[in-house]
Amino acid sequence: NCYIFNWGQEGQELLESANPGADFGLKMVLDIDQKEYIPFLQSTAAARIILHQQRSFPFLKDLGIYAMPGTETSIAVLEDQTQHLEAPYSSCTVDGSDIPVANIYSKFNSSYSIQSCLRSCFQEIMVKYCKCAYYLFPLLNGAHYCNNQEDPDWVPCYYNIWDTVSHREQCINMCQQPCNDSNYKMTISMADWPSAAAEDWIFHVLSYEKDTSLDITVNRDGIMRLNIYFEEFNYRSISESPTTNVVWLLSNLGGQFGFWMGGSVLCIIEFGE
């Protein structure tokens, strides 16, 4: 299961933190319910977490971090904002509209990112050469997901595309970084939770809250506590600026021209005298 907190979509009100610090952040108790795990499909028992901007698609598998059961995990967050210069100083994109790849994640009302562009590009190549779409990525318009009945050769075709360096380079060259981007730096600390002195009553309360009609027992192998908060409200802003623009270039050329032209005129006058 995947849950998004403070997504801000579909008219949902965004929640704001009043102050920095652990007392003013998000606090959760999670139960990963290992009894529901399917053998051979999942060998890791944990919750995977990612912090991202509103309207950015969360690529949890690639960018997430793990939180262990039986622990209290505190995540202190700092934000870095990066602003790149647009053309002609760089090849960054403002909103992805100038990228020759159709964003298959736009149907989720999500903004442009390099990850979404790379996956969209791969899906286009998959549909072009294998005649079907990869089942873990959203569908392109007019395409269908690969299946063994209609596309018996899709598996070797998929691995051939995945292992071909030229296809990856093609997508990397087309997918440019956004001109404005935000990253979240996380400081993570963990401690055993609950403590030996408190585990009896905590497990009893959590078992009761989970289901009052069934005899369900919560234990250390399935629960964890999460604290996510801003370390401080200040953020670091990294912005690019041109060392020389057209105005400065013309000004410098004019100054140099005037200096050397004036010196030349003086030399000619002195030589004439």
Curated annotation (Swiss-Prot):
A GO molecular function term, named singly, is: ligand-gated sodium channel activity
Q: Does this UniProt record's set of keywords contain Ion transport? A: yes
Q: Which reaction does it catalyse?
A: Na(+)(in) = Na(+)(out)
Looking at the UniProt entry, the stretches that span the membrane are 246-273
Q: Name one GO biological process term.
A: sodium ion homeostasis
In which compartments does the protein localize? Apical cell membrane; Cytoplasmic vesicle membrane
GO cellular-component terms in the record?
A: apical plasma membrane; cytoplasmic vesicle membrane; plasma membrane; sodium channel complex
Its membrane topology:
Multi-pass membrane protein
Topological domain ranges for the Extracellular compartment: 1-245
Task: Spell out the family assignment given in the record's similarity comment.
Answer: Belongs to the amiloride-sensitive sodium channel (TC 1.A.6) family. SCNN1B subfamily.
| Subunit text | Component of the heterotrimeric epithelial sodium channel (ENaC) composed of an alpha/SCNN1A, a beta/SCNN1B and a gamma/SCNN1G subunit.
Give a short account of what the protein does. This is one of the three pore-forming subunits of the heterotrimeric epithelial sodium channel (ENaC), a critical regulator of sodium balance and fluid homeostasis. ENaC operates in epithelial tissues, where it mediates the electrodiffusion of sodium ions from extracellular fluid through the apical membrane of cells, with water following osmotically. It plays a key role in maintaining sodium homeostasis through electrogenic sodium reabsorption in the kidneys. Additionally, ENaC is essential for airway surface liquid homeostasis, which is crucial for proper mucus clearance.
Protein name, per record? Epithelial sodium channel subunit beta
* This protein's encoding gene: SCNN1B
